[in-house]
Each structure stands twice: as structure tokens, then as C-alpha cells.
Swiss-Prot record:
Family, as annotated: Belongs to the TrbE/VirB4 family.
UniProt protein name: Type IV secretion system protein virB4
SMART domains: AAA
Main location: membrane
GO CC field: plasma membrane
Protein's organism: Bartonella henselae (strain ATCC 49882 / DSM 28221 / CCUG 30454 / Houston 1)
Amino acid sequence: MSMMKRESLPEDYIPYIRHINQHVIALNSRCLMTVMVVEGVNFDTADIDQLNSLHNQLNTLLKNIADERVALYSHIIRRRETIYPESQFFSSFAATLDEKYKKKMVSQELYRNDLFVSLLWNPASDKTEQLASFFQRLAKAKKTQSEPDQEAIRKIEELSQDLIEGLESYGARLLSVYAHGGILFSEQSEFLHQLVGGRRERIPLTFGTIASTIYSDRVIFGKETIEIRHESNERFAGMFGWKEYPSKTRPGMTDGLLTAPFEFILTQSFVFKSKAAASVIMGRKQNQMINAADRASSQIEALDEALDDLESNRFVLGEHHLSLAVFANHPKALAEYLSKARAHLTNGGAVIAREDLGLEAAWWAQLPGNFSYRARSGAITSRNFAALSPFHSFPIGKLEGNVWGTAVALLKTQAGSPYYFNFHYGDLGNTFVCGPSGSGKTVIVNFLLAQLQKHNPTMVFFDKDQGAEIFVRAGGGKYKPLKNGQPTGIAPLKGMEYTEKNKVFLRNWVLKLVTAEGQTVTEEERQDIAKAIDALGNLPHAQRSLSALQLFFDNTSKEGIAIRLQRWLKGNDLGWVFDNDQDDLNLDSQFIGYDMTDFLDNEEIRRPLMMYLFNRILDLIDGRRIIIVIDEFWKALEDDSFKAFAQDRLKTIRKQNGMMLFATQSPKDALNSTIAHTIIEQCPTQIFFPNQKANYKDYVEDFKLTEREFELIQSELSRESRRFLIKQGQSSVVAELNLRGMNDEIAVLSGTTKNIELVNQIISEYGADPDIWLPIFHQRRENQ
């Protein structure tokens, strides 16, 4: 293009020489630099009081590290995110679901905001250092040969640690050197490469200067537009700078940019001034206003107050600059994006200017340490800087390096950002899910479980009302709907090996049967039960039944063990529960579903049944990856066996590589339990769905949601939006699951009574292989 005319050599404008160590980089000005990546805080789900408190903390941090030899740069790099978590699935349904969902997600424009803060230590700002620098120049020492002293390195490392600790609420860490495929790469160089060429890629450590390594794209400057040429494409950029500062600042003035539908780099720098220099600057400004007979006496008084605040160490002063570089693949699109960006930047009252003659300087001023290129700068307070750079963002989750590996699922946030969902928060994967009927809870829980199949876990699903039956069967699992009056296929006396541990369990289980109506047993009867279990273990496997067990007891006593066992024997009113020909819990299957809805209100059957089921499930918690899902778990919590299981396993299952997921319609259901505290404490991942009837006490006081999070759940999020709140630790985000057009998959993820009957009919005709019956199900469902 004709307007593109000037091209520069990297060493002329890029000041970075080499790594001093894994964290520290040396500049040709003798400055040292470290860079931190910051997760940020989600302003969208935080209370105003929380944001104001963070603003004050940030101002305090800036005051604590203030030194005229220190400078800070903050960057927000907004970029397209196209990475989708790839995996293999153990069921064809999960694989097909993922394939369709992936096509939907990669077709959308998702953007992420990467936040960075760079710390620079400039020893030349010290008077003695300036003198040393003068003699160095006299000796014509080459910049690349100047060696930083150990004291300067120690100082910047110390300051970096202070900054990391001060930014704890924001999740900051130092960029470093890392190995990949046997080669060393530099995270700092990758960050700087984005500033130089607007593109992200791996940058290896080399023997040459960092400057020459990171300048891999040609940057050509026109009058108002920058062209960046890469071997495979070209991009265009335009820049804005602040011409006049707003009269007041508040946290979040630039937050509108964080949801913009284009890529950009927002750069800010803050070079600390000494108190003496700050007093001179502010005094000069005050005198100018007085001499000009400025009518705004309130501004003069405000400067008086500011000088007093400066002397009282309520803030520090620094030289600040702000620029915004906007990127597009075509000049026409760039013009559109720049128009939108201008609106966001002027929203806070600042006067901005499109860079033209100063375009090249503005571009290179984005690089930390290029102080002389900052053409548009002004003195502001640390409170102002904390407001202009508040490290606001949206959580994006974690793509790689999770306890079980790659992210479970990619979701879209309310802000159009990607969110890489994981059940695990740290090493704890227990999850609490809460949403009223019709909120989309079932679809989303089952979708996440289908995505979890990529990690090849054993999955145990305790269902209610058979809502997950189609999903379990389609996912290659075995499903056992336990119905009143129908043989359960459960025979505990045949299902367990007669080890000493298991015999103790079986004794207690038999005690449960013979005391179901409130009876008691004598010590002699306890011993009789123990002897009977021992004797039963000597029989052939096929003969180990309740009917056989009864024969070991005295049947002459009207209230004895034999009589009490009678009703549990085959042919009697409860014989269908446990006195079956074989024990078939499907524990050899990787995906198991049980529906116990019929028994939840039948305590007599529920107690021994759950006692046995959860004891057998314990055998699966042996170090393999496992998730245990319990729908409407509050009902199960009425049972002592489940309550004990939940309380113990919630605390210990992570050590055995497992996790639990509890789902319910109302938080009060969980809160009414005696183990409510354990559930809240041991489920760091919590998912809440819209609920117009949400109770403030339940959500805010008991589950510790912020008032803003409660507001979202109660009033802002609608059921139709299919949006929900994910909270992990203190961080939260509003995400959505868009399965529009995927009607076949939705019919599997959320089963209706009609569809469940249809599936069972088809399975009775064609067998249980989902690869065979699932296509027939979709065909018949559509024809209905």
C-alpha cells in the first residue's frame, strides 16, 4: 500500500538484550525487568464494596513499592482464542456430542483478555549510578557488554516478590523460562513479541539478543495505520493516546473494552516520582492556575488537599501514559473497530487522539522501558493509576495442567470469552449444583459428565425419576432402575467375597434387616448372626442366599432372627429386594446408573439397600479416576448410611483420585442437613442456575455468595438464556451452554418419561448397544 513507507530495524527501538536469569531481563539502558501475568478479578460478579476495597489495596501496594528508580507497565492484550480441548471419548455418543459442539464453538469469535504487569528497576535514576553511567560512556562500553551488579538483581527480585504478594487477590505469577519438547522457551520474550508484532507464538531462548529474536514480523508505519506483515498474512493496526486526562478516575473506566469484538493492546505506564519531585509538579500546577486567574477555585482547593494527601502519604505521584492499539485483518474493519474503541475510551471523560505523526513513537512506547517514546504522558496519583489499571477481567478457567489433565469443557462466558471448565479447584473436584426444575440443570450436568469421559473415569450416577437413564445408556453405561415389587437383581450374600472385613459388613447388614421395625437383638443373637455368616461362606457361591442363611437360626422363637428374616425371603413380601438368584450391580461397567426414587421414602428398604450399595461403591474408590453423582442428594441425606458415606468421602475422596457431584433444586435442601457445613466446605466448585425465588439467606449468608452473584441468580439471568453462575473459591463467572440445533443430543441429555419408554422399547427389540439403538431412537422420536 502506498501509505506504508517506513520500516525500522529491531535494535533501534527494542531495548531488550538477554535473560540475566529465568525471571530477570536486562535492557540496553541498564534497566532490569521482570514480567508478571495476572489472572485479574471478575468485576462483573463482584460487589461494589469489594471492588473499592481492592482499589484501596492496590493504591497501598503502589505506595509500598514507590521508588523513583521503579516503573510499572500494565498491559491488557485482548486476542482471539481458538483452542478447543481435544480428547478421545470412551463412548460414541460423547464423541459425537463433542464433535458437534466443537464445530459450534470454533465457529464463534471468542476473545480472552491477558493481563500483564512489568516491573522495571532503573539504577541510573540514582545519582551515583548516573555518574557511573557517565564514565561508562566515556569508556565507550558497549551496551550489550554492560553487566548489572548483583545488588540491582537482588533489588528487582525482592520488589517482584513484594508485587506478587501484593497482587495475591488477583492471581499473579512471574513469567519465566520453560521447557517444551526438549527446547527452552522464554515466556517474557513471547509477551514482548506480542507487543512488537501483535501476534502470539513460542519464542525460544537464543544466543542472540532478545530484540532480534522477537522481531519476526515486519512492522511498517503509514500516516495513521500500521501494517504488520507475517509470511502467511498481513494485519493492520491503529492507535489512540490520551490527549487530556479526565477530571476524576474510578475503577473500571476502561472495562467496556474487555468485551469488545476485536483484538487490541491497552498499554499503561507509571514511573514513580520522588515526593520532592511530586511536590514541585503539583505546586507548579497550582501556581499556573492562580496566575491564570482560573475561576475554578474548587480545583485550586482540590490541589491544596492533594498536596496535603501527598505529604501524608495517602498516595504517591508518577508519570503516566496510556495507549490503545487496535488490530484488524482489513483497513475497513479497522476503521469500524477504532470507532467502537474511541467510544469506550472517551466514556470516562478523557480526551483521546488518533496517533498519526507520533504513530511510530506510540507503537514503540508500548514496550516496557522505552520511556523516551512516551509522547503523551501526564502526572497522576497512585490512586488514579489503581483506578485506570484495576486488573479487571473475566476468568477463563484452565486449559492444561489440571489434576486430570486437559479442561473438561469449553464454555462461553456472558462476556463472549472462553471458559475452560474443570470440576477440580486445586486438587479437590467435589461439586455442588443447584437449580430449580426447568432451569437447564440436567442438560448441563449431563453434558459436563459426557465431556468428562475424555479422562476415562469410572462414573457412578444415583439418579432420580430416571432423568439420566437415556444418557447413561447412550454413554455406554448400564442402568438399573430399582422398582417397588420388582426383583432388584441384588443379592449381597452372593455379591461379596467372604473376607474378614466383608463378613463384618454382612453381619451389620443382616442386623439392619432384622431391626428394620425397631426391634433389638441380644448379644447371643449377634454371635449367632456372626456364626451364620461364617457358615454361609463355606457353602458354594450359588447357595449363599437369605433363604439359606435363615436355616442357621432357631425357627422356634416367635421373635427370633429366623422369624424376622422371613419377610425378606424369596416369595414373601420383601423377597424381591435381596433374595435374588445373582448379585448384579454392574460394578464391572465403566458407567453405572441407579435409580432409587421408589425407595427414597421407604425407610425400611432404603436403609439396608443404601448401606449395601455404598459399601460396594467404596470398593471402586481405589485410586482409579472416579466420579460419584447423586441427583437430589438431600433425600438420600436422610439415610444414615449415605450421610456417613458423604461426610467421610467428601473429605477423603480426593486422596484416592475421586470426586463427588451433588445436585439439588434448592440450596435449603442441603442446608437442612446436619452435614451442610461439610458440603459447603468440601465442594469448592459450585454451579448455580437462575432462580427467581432465590432466598437471600440461603445464597448469601450460608453459601457465601456475593450480593452481586445473588442479584445475577435471582433477577438478571433468565432460564431462557441457558446461563448459569460457576463459582470456584472466591472467583466466579457467568457461563452459557449453547446446544441450539442439537435436538438429538438434548433428547439424550435430558430424558422425558415418553422418551424413556421409547428407549426401553427399542432396547427390548434391538439390544443394549447404543450404536444400534440410538439412531433408531432419534428416527422414531422425530416421527412421533
